[in-house]
């Protein structure tokens, strides 16, 4: 008999959400998290501590293809990278799942389409209590349900910017936000519309991150166990190499192994690939799930561009991440 019915490696957006969904099943579930709990402390909202001193960045050293070291600036905590995310929760568009042509090459179509994912988007928006408004963004894909909560109102300067963009022929909209804000009774709201939502931890637990909305609700079920400071280092398989049966991990200076009927690898794009490659055996000499020899290759990081503007007028906005524009989503 296995130690657990399900072992989930990683407690971020994937693992934390899955744990919450599986918890009511009564199955014996183990969560393995390489990090610990992110402390609720005054430094959470300190620009100097967060961005200059890198208080919450892992000291990991990684190596590029030429062996040169670099610091990836990743975060390892219960809740994963969502502990410092901006809580903007968008859906991919239908076209994103198809073949896309770029100057550097072709991105092949996914084996699934948007329609396959739509019910899960709706479920996730409920789990993460997303605030938004359907119908404002002309690029948004079809949905089977409205957002679970109304959109967050813009502050005056952001509203003026929205109006100006609309006057210029664009289609600004209220960004879908995962924050626990009650505009009807702000005096009892968990979210206080602070100026530190994007890129900072939330000491109020008002951000809908994977710890607050996933792991903590899951741990209310007695069948769910969480081990922190427990990085997975290798997956074991059955003798035929047809199924993963266990996980080797480090904790408190020693190495332990647990077995599970189902093992979920949800420790981020890079670290999931690393774990699969590190689990090579005689049946899988190139690493698990790597018959294509593509695991760990072709990684595309979260790509973004920034536009900065200087204003002659003061901008008193505090809670500013409520506005979105997708008119140029596909570069048209």
Over which residues does each language-model region extend?
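Hydrophobic or amphipathic alpha-helical targeting/insertion segments
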Residues: 31-34, 81
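Glycine-rich loop(s) and the adjacent beta-strand/alpha-helix scaffold that form part
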Residues: 24, 35-40, 44-45, 221, ...
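N-terminal Rossmann-like FAD-binding beta1-loop-alpha1 element of flavoenzymes
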Residues: 6-31
């Amino acid at each position: 008999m296995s130690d657990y019915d399900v072992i989930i490696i990683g407690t971020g957006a994937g693992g934390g959400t899955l744990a919450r969904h599986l918890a009511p099943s009564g199955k014996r579930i183990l969560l393995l998290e390489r990090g610990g709990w992110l402390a609720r402390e005054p430094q959470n909202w300190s620009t100097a501590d967060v961005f200059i001193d890198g208080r919450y960045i892992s000291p990991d050293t990684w190596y590029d293809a030429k062996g040169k070291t670099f610091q990836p600036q990743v975060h390892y905590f219960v809740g994963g990278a969502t502990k410092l995310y901006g809580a903007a929760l968008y859906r991919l568009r239908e076209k994103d799942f198809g073949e896309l042509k770029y100057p550097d090459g072709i991105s092949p179509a996914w084996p699934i389409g948007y329609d396959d994912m739509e019910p899960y988007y709706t479920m996730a928006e409920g789990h993460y209590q997303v605030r938004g408004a359907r119908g404002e963004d002309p690029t948004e894909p079809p949905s089977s349900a409205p957002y679970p909560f109304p959109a967050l109102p813009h502050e005056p300067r952001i509203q003026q910017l929205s109006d100006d963009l609309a006057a210029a022929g664009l289609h600004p909209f209220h960004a879908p936000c995962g924050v626990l804000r009650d505009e009807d009774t702000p005096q009892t709201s968990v979210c206080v519309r602070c100026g530190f939502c994007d890129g900072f931890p939330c000491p109020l637990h008002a951000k809908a991150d994977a710890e607050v909305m996933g792991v903590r609700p899951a741990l209310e079920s007695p069948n769910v166990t969480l081990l922190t400071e427990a990085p997975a280092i290798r997956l074991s398989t059955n003798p035929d190499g047809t199924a993963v049966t266990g996980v080797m991990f480090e904790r408190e200076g020693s190495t332990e192994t647990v077995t599970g009927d189902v093992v979920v690898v949800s420790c981020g794009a890079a670290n999931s690939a690393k774990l699969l490659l590190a689990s090579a055996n005689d049946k899988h000499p190139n690493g698990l799930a790597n018959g294509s020899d593509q695991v760990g290759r072709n990684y595309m990081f979260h790509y973004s561009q920034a536009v900065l503007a200087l204003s002659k007028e003061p901008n008193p906005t505090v809670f500013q991440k409520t506005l979105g524009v997708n008119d140029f989503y596909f570069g048209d």
